[in-house]
């Protein structure tokens, strides 16, 4: 059994509302198919894969259904964390109900909790910048509020790990 981590999948979202990563350059051409080929060549069914964020451009769970079905179809048990572009993110209980209702049995939410995977503990929180110069934002952002909230979530996740 192996443990892998991959972030920033940026899958396209719901049919008819897709956002192509090719707008960021030709290197993103056919990215989902290339991801699938590489994943299937490397990841075994009993492996664990952490996907710590920026999973899909979808704006809500229903729009993300196709992308989650794709991820669920890939080998391995997946642990999904929240990234700064995961606007679809809901409460953990809503996401767990959604995953169960759609038969996404290999997907697990990593949020204020921890998992044991072989000889490793998987835990964490969304990363954030400590200063305004490092992150461009739209509108007023309370940096202290964001950093304090994510620090509390990280502490809860670490406490769940011990």
List where the protein language model places each region.
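Conserved catalytic scaffold of divalent metal-dependent phosphoesterases
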Residues: 9-14, 90-162
């Amino acid at each position: 059994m192996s443990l892998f981590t991959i972030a920033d999948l940026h899958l396209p979202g719901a049919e008819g509302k897709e956002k192509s990563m090719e707008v960021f350059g030709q290197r993103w051409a056919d990215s989902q198919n290339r991801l699938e080929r590489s994943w299937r060549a490397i990841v075994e069914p009993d492996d664990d894969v952490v996907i710590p964020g920026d999973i899909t451009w979808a704006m809500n769970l229903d729009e993300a259904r196709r992308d989650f079905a794709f991820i669920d179809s890939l080998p391995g048990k997946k642990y999904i964390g929240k990234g700064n572009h995961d606007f679809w993110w809901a409460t953990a209980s809503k996401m767990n109900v959604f995953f169960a209702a759609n038969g996404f049995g290999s997907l697990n939410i990593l949020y204020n909790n921890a998992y044991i995977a072989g000889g490793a503990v998987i835990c964490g929180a969304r990363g954030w910048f400590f200063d305004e110069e490092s992150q461009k934002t739209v509108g007023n952002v309370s940096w202290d509020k964001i950093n304090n909230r994510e620090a509390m979530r990280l502490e809860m996740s670490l406490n769940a790990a011990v």
